[in-house]
Amino acid sequence: MKFLAFALETNRWKKINGDYRMKKYLGGCHCGKVQYEVELNLKNAISCNCSICMKRGSLLDFIPESQFKLLCGENELQDYLFNKKLIHHYFCKNCGILSFGKGIAPGGTKEVVAINLRCLEGINLKTITIKEYDGKSR
């Protein structure tokens, strides 16, 4: 849960500093069976060193569920839970790409979506500030 708190605090920081330009992006898996639309600010990403994030090489941003829309592939998703079973890691059954996950924000009331920014179309990762998170020690 500390990871989600860190991610949400990063979003609050963006709002406080007035740098919260929202834009819609399309994303999905490699084979195209899972596709979604997200609305977010691409200023910051989180690189976590926990076991699953290190193995899959994700760069993450967390958004409220209201800013996420699954366009197709709901039946193509496999859910993977581990450790405390708080975050649903969804991956495509066909190509294996994990392009997003869902979990409950700290406080237990709002669902947030973790977007793997590497799965979004038309973005330049070189323009994004990457913030390190020590999930390995949690």
Where are these regions (language model features)?
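A short Gly-Trp-Pro
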Residues: 13-28, 33-138
